[in-house]
C-alpha cells in the first residue's frame, strides 16, 4: 500500500531560553544563561517546515506547551495567585522557575514513539507518549503531549495514542529519538530498531553521563504499539559515545527506508547489529562514518547525524543538516565525498537553526516522523498540515506574541505568563485543537 512519511515539527515555545537544564547534552550546558531570541527560534523552525513542504515533503506542526507551568509549582508547595507563585519561586528557588518554563517540548522527536499501520498487529497507527523520566523539566511534558496527539490523530479507527509509561527510572523512555525504522517503501512492513542505553542487570552502561533510555522501556513501548514481534530489534547504544555527549541515538544515527547513516562507534556490538540488519532487511545499506573522517566530538558539535534523511519521489535521498555542518571543514568535506559516492544521498539541504542548536536540538530533534497511508493522512486533523496559509498565519502569530529577547530573569514576569496563555488560546483555535491546555480547562481561556 502507498504511504508517505509526514514530518510533524515542534513549534518553538514563547519561553525558549538557555538554562543548561539537560546534563549530558553538552550544547545545553555550554550555552547556559545566554540571552535567547524566542521569535527568531520559532521563525527558524517555521522556515524549515515551509521549505521542506515546498520541496514536496509532507509537513505538519505540533504546538508548544503552556509555560511557565504553574500547576507544577503549586505541587512543589508555592501558594497564592499565579502572579504570587511566580514571584515566590523567582525569589526562593529560581531553578524551579526555569525548569517549569522550559520550551523543550519543541523537540518532538521525544514526544512519542510511532508504529506505522504496516508494522502493527491490529493495522492501526500507534503512538506511545514518552515519559522523559530522566530530566525533571521534560518529565512534565507527557500529559499535554498526549492531549495534543489525541487532538491531531483524533480518528480512533485509525490511530491509537497510548499514555506514557510509569514515571520511574527503570522505564525511562525518550521516544522516537531512540527509535529507527528500516525497510523498503514506507507502506511495506519495516524493521523497527529500539535503541537503549542501559538495562537492569547489565553493567555495560555509561559512567559520565546518564543513559536515558532503558531496554525495559523499549520493550514495553514495542508491546504497547503492537509491533509485530518479527519486526523488532533491540540494540544498545555504545555507552562510550553517551559519555561523549550522545544523549539520544538521533545524535549519532539516522535511518530512512533501507539506509542507516551512522557513526562507526554508534552502537555496542555494531558489526553484529549490521549483520543482523543485512540478513533481515532487503537491500539494507549501512553508511558508516569512520572516526578517522569524523570524530564523535565533531559529530556532536555539528550534529551531523541529527539530520533528516528524506526520500524524493525518484528514490534519491536528501540529507537535511544544520548550518554548523557546513561551517566545519572536516564534516563538510566528508559530506561532499558522500555525495560523490555510490549511495542514495544526492542532495544536502542546510538550515540555520542556531537558537535550537544552542540548546542541543538539531533538525531531527525538531520533528516526529509518522508514516501514513493516504487514507490515514486524510484522517489527521487537517488544520495542522503545513501550507502557504498556515505558514503565513503562524508567522503573523509569532510576530504578535513572541519576544525577541529573553533571559532567565524575564521568566518571573507575570506578563510573560499572560502573553503565553493568550497566544496558546489563539493557536489552539487556529489549529482546531479544542481545549488541550490545562489553563483552558480551568476556565482561563476560550479554546
Curated annotation (Swiss-Prot):
Keyword Ribonucleoprotein assigned to the entry: answer is no
Entry keyword annotation includes RNA-binding: no
Query: Which Enzyme Commission number(s) are listed?
Result: 3.5.3.23
Q: Which reaction does it catalyse?
A: N(2)-succinyl-L-arginine + 2 H2O + 2 H(+) = N(2)-succinyl-L-ornithine + 2 NH4(+) + CO2
Gene Ontology terms for molecular function:
N-succinylarginine dihydrolase activity
- Could you say which protein family the record assigns here? Belongs to the succinylarginine dihydrolase family.
Q: By its UniProt entry, which HAMAP family does this protein fall under?
A: AstB
Q: What function does the entry list? A: Catalyzes the hydrolysis of N(2)-succinylarginine into N(2)-succinylornithine, ammonia and CO(2).
Q: What is this protein called?
A: N-succinylarginine dihydrolase
Amino acid at each position: 500500500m502507498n504511504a508517505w512519511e509526514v514530518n510533524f515539527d515542534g513549534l518553538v515555545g514563547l519561553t525558549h531560553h538557555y538554562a543548561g537544564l539537560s546534563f549530558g547534552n553538552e550544547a545545553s550546558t555550554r550555552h547556559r544563561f545566554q540571552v535567547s531570541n524566542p521569535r527568531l527560534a520559532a521563525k527558524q523552525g517555521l522556515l524549515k517546515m515551509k521549505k521542506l513542504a515546498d520541496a514536496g515533503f509532507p509537513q505538519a506542526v505540533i504546538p508548544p506547551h503552556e509555560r511557565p507551568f504553574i500547576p507544577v509549582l503549586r505541587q512543589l508547595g508555592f501558594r497564592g495567585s499565579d502572579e504570587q507563585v511566580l514571584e515566590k519561586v523567582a525569589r526562593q528557588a529560581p531553578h524551579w522557575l526555569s525548569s517549569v518554563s522550559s520550551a523543550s517540548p519543541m523537540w518532538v522527536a521525544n514526544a512519542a514513539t510511532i508504529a506505522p499501520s504496516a508494522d502493527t498487529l491490529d493495522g492501526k497507527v500507534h503512538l506511545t507518549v514518552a515519559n522523559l523520566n530522566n530530566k525533571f523539566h521534560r518529565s512534565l511534558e507527557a500529559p499535554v503531549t498526549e492531549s495534543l496527539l489525541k487532538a491531531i490523530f483524533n480518528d480512533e479507527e485509525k490511530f491509537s495514542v497510548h499514555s506514557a509509561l510509569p514515571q520511574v527510572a527503570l522505564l525511562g523512555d525518550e521516544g522516537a529519538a531512540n527509535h529507527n525504522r528500516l525497510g523498503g517503501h514506507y507502506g511495506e512492513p519495516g524493521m523497527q530498531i529500539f535503541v537503549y542505553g542501559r538495562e537492569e542487570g547489565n553493567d555495560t552502561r555509561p559512567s559520565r553521563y546518564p543513559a536515558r533510555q532503558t531496554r525495559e522501556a523499549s520493550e514495553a513501548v514495542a508491546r504497547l504499539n503492537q509491533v509485530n514481534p518479527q519486526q523488532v530489534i533491540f540494540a544498545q547504544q555504545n555507552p562510550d559515545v553517551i559519555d561523549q555527549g550522545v544523549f539520544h541515538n538521533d545524535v549519532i544515527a539516522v535511518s530512512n527506508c533501507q539506509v542507516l547513516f551512522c557513526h562507526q562507534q554508534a552502537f555496542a556490538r555494531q558489526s553484529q547489529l549490521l549483520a543482523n540488519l543485512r540478513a533481515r532487511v532487503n537491500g539494507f545499506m549501512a553508511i558508516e562514518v569512520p572516526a578517522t573522517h569524523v570524530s564523535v566530538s565533531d559529530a556532536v558539535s555539528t550534529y551531523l547525524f541529527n539530520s533528516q534523511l528524506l526520500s524524493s519521489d525518484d528514490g534519491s535521498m536528501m540529507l537535511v543538516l544544520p548550518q554548523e555542518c557546513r561551517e566545519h571543514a572536516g564534516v563538510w568535506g566528508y559530506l561532499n565525498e558522500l555525495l560523490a559516492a555510490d549511495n542514495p544521498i544526492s542532495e544536502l539541504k542546510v538550515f540555520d537553526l542556531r537558537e535550537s542548536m544552542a540548546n542541543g536540538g538539531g533538525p531531527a530533534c525538531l520533528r516526529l516522523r509518522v508514516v501514513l497511508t493516504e487514507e490515514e493522512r486524510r484522517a489527521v486533523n487537517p488544520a495542522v498540515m503545513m501550507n502557504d496559509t498556515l505558514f503565513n498565519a503562524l508567522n503573523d502569530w509569532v510576530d504578535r506574541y513572541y519576544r525577541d529577547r529573553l533571559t532567565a530573569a524575564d521568566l518571573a514576569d507575570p506578563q510573560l505568563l499572560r502573553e503565553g496563555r493568550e497566544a496558546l488560546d489563539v493557536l489552539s483555535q487556529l489549529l482546531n485543537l479544542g481545549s488541550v491546555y490545562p489553563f483552558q480547562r480551568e476556565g482561563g481561556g476560550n479554546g
